[in-house]
């Protein structure tokens, strides 16, 4: 899954199921001495990062036999992992950040207490995978405040409606699309979306403006 130089570098957060170890799958070779570079197909990587416990089976890589599930129990919002990757990789750590785009999945629903073990377990997963909590903490950090002030950090997350859709309701894509269209149609979000697009088109210009 390794790409040639010049292509977009991508990383996915996953968990190694047998030892419950959070890790990262990359389409590039990490030069950091503590990082392990795994070999897998794009399909295997995508399936692994989407294999949420209680909803999907873990994914076994055909070539190596390693078993994986998603990184959501620990890192459903991977912004800290992404920035940590930038900070530790040789050749990247001294570069300025041009733009950070964070896409949320909406606010979580406050469920009533139930005696069903499955419901309790799913409730625990929902609590620990709340990506908005991570977003709020990052936005209030020194780096988050600086990136937001200089129009280099953007967070989009639908505030209402998504919490009523379950993780395995894949047939509800039209409803998700309608909620997203309504959310992005608000004037304030439209302005932020335009600014985000501008930053993504020329992140290097952001770095020059905010050295």
What function would you assign to each model-found segment?
Residues 1-211:
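Conserved catalytic cores and adjacent C-terminal regulatory segments
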């Amino acid at each position: 899954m390794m790409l040639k130089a010049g292509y977009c570098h991508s990383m996915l957060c996953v968990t190694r199921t047998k030892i419950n170890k959070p890790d990262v799958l990359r389409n590039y070779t990490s030069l950091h001495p503590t990082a392990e570079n795994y070999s897998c197909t794009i399909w295997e990587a995508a399936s692994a990062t989407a294999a949420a416990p209680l909803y999907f089976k873990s994914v076994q890589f055909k070539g190596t036999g390693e078993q994986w599930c998603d990184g959501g129990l620990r890192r459903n919002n991977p912004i800290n992992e992404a920035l940590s990757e930038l900070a530790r990789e040789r050749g990247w750590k001294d570069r300025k950040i041009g733009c950070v785009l964070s896409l949320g999945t909406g606010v979580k629903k406050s469920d009533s207490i139930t005696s069903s073990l499955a419901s309790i377990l799913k409730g625990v997963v929902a609590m620990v995978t709340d990506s908005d909590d991570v977003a709020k903490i990052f936005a209030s950090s020194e780096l988050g405040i600086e990136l937001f002030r200089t129009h280099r950090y953007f967070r989009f997350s639908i505030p209402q409606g998504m919490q009523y859709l379950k993780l395995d309701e894949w047939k509800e894509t039209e409803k998700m699309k309608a909620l997203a269209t309504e959310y992005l149609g608000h004037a304030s979000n439209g302005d932020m979306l335009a600014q985000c697009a501008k930053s993504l088109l020329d992140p290097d210009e952001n770095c020059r403006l905010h050295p």
